[in-house]
C-alpha cells in the first residue's frame, strides 16, 4: 500500500483544479443555476477557524450542487475598507492600502490551501477604485431619485474611533467595534432613505421562508411598525404646539405628564435660559444611547415649568418634563405618560410624585377597588374614568379616541416605524469617498460622472485623531463643477456597510468597466440561492442589502425583489480558555494535560481552565488553521468542521476531534488501496443479476447516496458525515468477508467484485464535497482518469433503497399479540404461516378453534378464533 501523503496530494489536486479552470463559470441558460455565497471576509491578516467552518459549509454545498447538474457560482472577495486598516497605520506606520493588500494576498493563499471550489476569476476587493466607482455612481443616482439627502442631525459619536455610527452599530450603548460609550453630537450627515421601503421590507419577510425565524423576527422588531395616533398638545407660555405619537390613545384620560427628548427643539429653547436644564441635557447626551440601556437605566427627568393642555378636556394641564428615556429618533421625540398602564411611565411617576390613575380595568374587577401598585397593568379590559370612552374595550377605545382627535382637527391615526433613515457619513480616510463637492455659492454639487471615481489621496498622515482627508492640504480643494469657483470635496467617506450591500450583485459581472453589473447577468444569477454567515449581521448587513436591492430596482438598475433566497446562520467555533498562575492568558499550544491536571508545557506550573467560549485573540483560545492544515491537511480540517455538531450550533474545537478526522481519512485510503481482493477493471459491464451478498453491498451504497444527498440539501452536515462513516464501515465489513474468501482461495464472485467496485466509486463521489483532495486521489487509485468533480452524483437505484423486509403486526381477535418481519413481496400464505408460528400468537390461540386469518399485505395479519 502506498502511504497517503496529504501535503503532496492536496497540493497536486489544487494545482490540477486551477490549471483546468474547474470552478470558473459563465451564464448558461441551458443549465439550472445555483449561486452559493458565504459572507465575504474583512482582510484582517489571517483566516481563523470561524472562516474555515463558514467556507467549508459553502464549499460542500457548491460541490454537491455541481455534482447534481447545476451551473454553480461560488465567488470570493474582500470587504476591504474599514477602521482596522487606519488603526494599523497608527500602530505600525504602514499605509492602510498596503496593509490591506498584503493581508488580502496572505488570506487568499490560506483559503486556497483549503481546496475551496471558488471562481477566483471573479474576486473583488471593495477598496479598489474599479469597484467603488460604481458605488459612487449608484449614490448619485440615489441622490437624483430622492433616496439620498443631507441634513443636520443628532448622531452616535464614537469618541475612540472619532466617527459616526449608525443606530444598528451601537450595541448596548457602545460602539460595535471599539466598545466605547457612544455620545450624542449634532452634525451634517448624508442619509439613505431606507424608510421609503419600510413597509415592503417588513411585509416581504413573510416570503423569506428559507430564512431562520430568529433573523426574520429580529428584522421585524428593528423595523418596528407601530399603529397609533399623532396629535398635538397646546402649550403654555406661547410655545408652539407639541406633537406626540402614541400607540395607546385609549389611555389619554390616565395621562399625568408629558415628556420630551433631551434633543427636542423645545428642550433646546428652554435650556437657552436655564443653565440647570442645559446641564441635565448634557448629562443625558453623555450616557448610553441604546434603547436597551435606556429601558433599564434609572428614569430621570427635569421639570421645565411648562404645561400642556389635555386634548379632550379644556383647562386640564399636564406638566412637561425633559426625560432621559424619550428618544428623538422614534416617533416625534415627545410622549404623554400614563403611569397606570406603562411600566416606564409608572417608574417615572413614582419617582417624581405624579398621579397614577387607572383607566383600563380588567374584566370582572370593581373599578372602585382596582389600584396599581408597583406593576403597571398592560392587559385587556374595559375603559373607566374616561368620559366618552367608558365601557369600551381597549381596541374600540383606541378607534374612538382617534376619531375624536381627527374630528377636532388635532391629529390623525397613523403608522410609525422604529426604523430610521441610514446615516452613511463616516469621518475616516479608509473608505469610499462620497462624490459630492461643497460650493459656498452652489451648495452641495454632485461630482460629474465623467470625473468618477473620486479616489483617495495616498499622501496622508495618521499622526492625529480624526479624518486625514479633512486635514489634507490639496486633495479637498477643487473647482465647483457648476460655477467654477473655489470649493471643497466632501471629506466624509461612506459607511463600509455600503460596500457589502451590493457586492453579491457585482459577482455576477465583476469585470464590467462600464456598468456596476449587466442586468441580464443579474437576472440569470440572482437571487443568491444560499447565503451563509453569522446571525450577528441580522439587522446590519442583511437589512441594508435588502434595502439596497430595492433602491437599485427603484432606480432601474435591476428587477429583483430579494437578494438572498436562502439564509443559513452558522454557529461559532469555541475552545476552552487557559490562564497561568500570573493571570495571563495562554494559547492552547502552551498547555498540556499531565498527571491528571492541565499545566504549562514549559515549566509544569498550574493552569486554570476556563469556560468554553468563542475563539478570541484577546483570550488566546485560538487555534491557527494554517498549522492544522500543515499538520493534518485541509480535508481533515474540513471533515472535523462538518462532523461533531449541527452546523447552526457552536462547535468545540478539540485535538481528539481533528485526530479522529485524520484517522478516518487514512481508513478510507486503506479501504481503496487494500480491499483484500481483486476488483474488476473500471468500466466493466454490470452482471445480468446479483446475488444476496452483492445486493447487500449495493443496497448500502445506494441508500448512502440518497441519504447523504438529502442531508447536504438540508444542511445536516453532521448527519451526512455520520452516514458516510456508517456506509464506509458497512463496506469495510463486507470487504472483510470477501477478503477472507479470497485468502482461503475462493475469489469473490463476479457480481460481488463488481458491487465492491461500484461501492468504492460511489464512496469516492460521496466523499468529494467534504474531502475533495482525498476523493480525487481515491478516484485515481480506482483506475480512473480525469477529474472526479466532473462526474455526477451517483444515480440511486430506487429498487435498492426500498427496504426488502417489512414489520407486520399480528392481532388475535383484534388485540395486538406480536410483530413479525416478512419479505416485502411475501404472499398471504407465507404471512399466515409466519404469524401462526410466532410463540406469542400460539399462546393466544391455544385450545381455541381457528375461524379465519385475514392478511393485509405488508401491514397486518388478523387471526380470528
Curated annotation (Swiss-Prot):
Gene Ontology molecular function, alphabetical: aminoacyl-tRNA deacylase activity; ATP binding; leucine-tRNA ligase activity
Top enzyme class: ligase
GO cellular component assignments: cytosol
Catalytic activity: tRNA(Leu) + L-leucine + ATP = L-leucyl-tRNA(Leu) + AMP + diphosphate
Keyword Transmembrane belongs to the record: no
A Gene Ontology biological process term: leucyl-tRNA aminoacylation
Positions in coiled-coil regions: none
Motif window: 'KMSKS' region: 614-618
Pfam families recorded: Anticodon_1 (PF08264), tRNA-synt_1 (PF00133), tRNA-synt_1_2 (PF13603), tRNA-synt_1g (PF09334)
PROSITE patterns documented for this protein: AA_TRNA_LIGASE_I
Binding site residues for ATP: 617
The enzyme's E.C. designation: 6.1.1.4
Keywords: Aminoacyl-tRNA synthetase, ATP-binding, Cytoplasm, Ligase, Nucleotide-binding, Protein biosynthesis
Family matches, as InterPro entries: aa-tRNA-synth_I_CS (IPR001412), aa-tRNA-synth_Ia (IPR002300), Leu-tRNA-ligase (IPR002302), Leu_tRNA-synth_edit (IPR025709), M/V/L/I-tRNA-synth_anticd-bd (IPR013155), Methionyl/Leucyl_tRNA_Synth (IPR015413), Rossmann-like_a/b/a_fold (IPR014729), tRNAsynth_Ia_anticodon-bd (IPR009080)
Chain span(s) of sequence motif 'HIGH' region: 41-51
Origin superkingdom: Bacteria
Family, similarity comment: Belongs to the class-I aminoacyl-tRNA synthetase family.
Protein name: Leucine--tRNA ligase
Organism: Rhodospirillum centenum (strain ATCC 51521 / SW)
Amino acid at each position: 500500500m502506498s502511504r497517503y501523503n496529504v501535503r503532496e496530494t492536496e497540493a497536486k489536486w489544487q494545482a490540477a483544479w486551477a490549471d483546468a479552470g474547474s470552478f470558473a463559470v459563465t451564464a448558461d441558460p441551458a443549465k439550472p443555476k445555483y449561486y452559493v455565497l458565504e459572507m465575504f471576509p474583512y482582510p484582517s491578516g489571517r483566516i481563523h477557524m470561524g472562516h474555515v467552518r463558514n467556507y467549508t459549509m459553502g464549499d460542500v454545498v457548491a460541490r454537491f450542487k455541481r455534482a447534481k447538474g447545476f451551473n454553480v457560482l461560488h465567488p470570493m472577495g474582500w470587504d476591504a475598507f474599514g477602521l482596522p486598516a487606519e488603526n494599523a497605520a497608527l500602530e505600525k506606520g504602514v499605509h492602510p492600502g498596503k496593509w490591506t493588500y498584503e493581508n488580502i494576498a496572505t488570506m487568499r493563499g490560506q483559503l486556497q490551501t483549503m481546496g475551496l471550489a471558488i471562481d477566483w476569476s471573479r474576486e473583488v476587493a471593495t477598496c479598489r477604485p474599479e469597484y467603488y466607482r460604481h458605488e459612487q455612481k449608484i449614490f448619485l443616482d440615489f441622490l437624483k431619485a430622492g433616496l439620498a439627502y443631507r441634513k443636520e442631525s443628532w448622531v452616535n459619536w464614537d469618541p475612540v474611533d472619532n466617527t459616526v455610527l449608525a443606530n444598528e452599530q451601537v450595541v448596548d450603548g457602545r460602539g460595535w467595534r471599539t466598545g466605547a460609550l457612544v455620545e450624542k453630537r449634532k452634525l451634517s450627515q448624508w442619509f439613505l432613505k431606507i424608510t421609503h421601503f419600510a413597509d415592503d421590507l417588513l411585509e416581504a419577510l413573510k416570503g423569506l421562508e428559507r430564512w431562520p425565524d430568529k433573523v426574520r423576527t429580529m428584522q421585524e422588531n428593528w423595523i418596528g411598525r407601530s399603529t397609533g395616533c399623532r396629535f398635538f398638545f397646546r402649550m403654555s407660555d406661547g410655545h408652539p404646539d407639541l406633537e406626540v405619537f402614541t400607540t395607546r390613545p385609549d389611555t389619554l384620560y390616565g395621562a399625568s405628564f408629558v415628556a420630551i427628548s433631551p434633543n427636542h427643539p423645545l428642550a433646546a429653547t428652554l435650556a437657552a435660559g436655564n443653565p440647570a436644564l442645559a446641564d441635565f441635557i448634557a448629562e443625558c447626551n453623555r450616557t448610553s444611547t441604546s434603547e436597551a440601556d435606556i429601558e433599564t437605566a434609572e428614569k430621570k427627568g427635569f421639570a421645565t415649568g411648562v404645561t400642556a393642555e389635555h386634548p379632550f378636556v379644556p383647562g386640564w394641564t399636564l406638566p412637561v418634563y425633559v426625560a432621559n428615556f424619550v428618544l428623538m429618533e422614534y416617533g416625534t421625540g415627545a410622549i404623554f405618560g400614563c403611569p397606570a398602564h406603562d411600566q416606564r411611565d409608572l417608574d417615572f411617576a413614582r419617582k417624581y410624585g405624579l398621579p397614577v390613575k387607572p383607566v383600563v380595568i380588567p374584566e370582572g374587577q370593581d373599578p372602585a377597588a382596582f389600584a396599581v401598585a408597583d406593576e403597571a397593568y398592560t392587559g385587556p379590559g374595559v375603559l373607566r374614568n374616561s368620559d366618552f370612552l367608558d365601557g369600551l374595550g381597549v381596541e374600540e377605545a383606541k378607534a374612538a379616541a382617534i376619531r375624536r382627535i381627527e374630528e377636532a382637527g388635532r391629529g390623525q391615526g397613523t403608522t410609525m416605524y422604529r426604523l430610521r433613515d441610514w446615516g452613511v457619513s463616516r469621518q475616516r480616510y479608509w473608505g469610499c469617498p462620497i462624490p459630492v463637492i461643497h460650493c459656498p455659492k452652489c451648495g452641495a454639487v454632485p461630482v460629474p460622472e465623467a470625473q468618477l471615481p473620486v479616489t483617495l489621496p495616498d499622501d496622508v498622515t495618521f499622526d492625529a485623531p480624526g479624518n486625514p482627508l479633512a486635514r489634507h492640504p490639496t486633495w479637498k480643494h477643487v473647482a465647483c463643477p457648476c460655477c467654477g469657483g473655489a470649493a471643497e470635496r466632501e471629506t466624509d467617506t461612506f459607511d463600509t456597510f455600503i460596500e457589502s450591500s451590493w457586492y453579491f450583485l457585482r459577482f455576477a459581472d465583476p469585470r464590467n468597466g462600464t456598468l456596476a453589473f449587466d442586468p441580464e447577468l443579474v437576472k440569470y444569477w440572482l437571487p443568491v440561492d444560499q447565503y451563509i454567515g453569522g446571525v450577528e449581521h441580522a439587522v446590519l448587513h442583511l437589512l441594508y442589502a435588502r434595502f439596497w436591492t430595492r433602491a437599485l430596482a427603484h432606480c432601474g438598475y435591476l428587477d429583483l425583489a430579494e437578494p438572498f433566497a436562502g439564509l443559513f446562520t452558522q454557529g461559532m467555533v469555541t475552545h476552552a480558555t487557559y490562564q497561568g498562575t500570573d493571570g495571563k492568558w495562554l494559547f492552547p499550544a502552551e498547555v498540556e494535560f499531565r498527571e491528571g491536571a492541565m499545566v504549562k508545557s514549559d515549566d509544569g506550573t498550574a493552569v486554570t481552565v476556563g469556560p468554553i467560549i468563542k475563539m478570541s485573540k484577546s483570550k488566546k483560545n485560538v487555534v491557527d488553521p494554517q498549522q492544522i492544515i500543515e499538520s493534518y491537511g485541509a480535508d481533515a480540517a474540513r471533515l472535523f468542521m462538518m462532523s461533531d455538531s449541527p452546523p447552526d450550533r457552536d462547535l468545540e474545537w478539540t485535538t481528539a476531534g481533528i485526530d479522529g478526522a485524520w484517522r478516518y481519512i487514512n481508513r478510507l485510503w486503506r479501504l481503496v488501496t487494500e480491499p483484500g481482493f481483486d476488483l474488476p477493471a473500471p468500466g466493466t459491464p454490470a452482471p445480468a443479476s446479483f446475488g444476496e451478498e452483492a445486493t447487500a453491498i449495493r443496497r448500502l451504497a445506494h441508500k448512502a447516496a440518497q441519504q447523504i444527498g438529502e442531508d447536504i440539501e438540508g444542511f445536516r452536515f453532521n448527519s451526512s458525515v455520520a452516514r458516510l462513516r456508517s456506509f464506509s464501515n458497512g463496506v469495510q465489513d463486507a470487504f472483510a468477508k470477501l477478503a477472507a474468501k479470497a485468502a482461503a482461495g475462493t475469489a469473490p464472485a463476479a457480481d460481488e467484485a463488481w458491487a465492491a467496485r461500484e461501492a468504492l466509486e460511489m464512496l469516492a463521489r460521496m466523499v468529494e464535497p467534504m474531502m475533495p483532495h482525498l476523493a480525487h486521489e481515491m478516484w485515481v487509485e480506482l483506475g480512473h482518469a480525469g477529474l472526479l468533480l466532473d462526474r455526477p452524483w451517483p444515480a440511486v437505484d430506487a429498487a435498492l433503497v426500498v427496504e426488502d423486509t417489512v414489520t407486520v403486526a399480528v392481532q388475535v381477535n383484534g388485540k395486538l399479540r406480536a410483530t413479525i418481519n416478512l419479505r416485502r413481496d411475501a404472499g398471504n400464505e407465507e404471512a399466515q404461516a409466519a404469524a401462526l408460528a410466532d410463540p406469542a400468537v400460539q399462546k393466544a390461540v391455544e385450545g381455541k378453534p381457528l375461524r379465519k386469518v385475514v392478511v393485509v399485505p405488508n401491514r397486518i395479519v388478523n387471526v380470528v378464533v
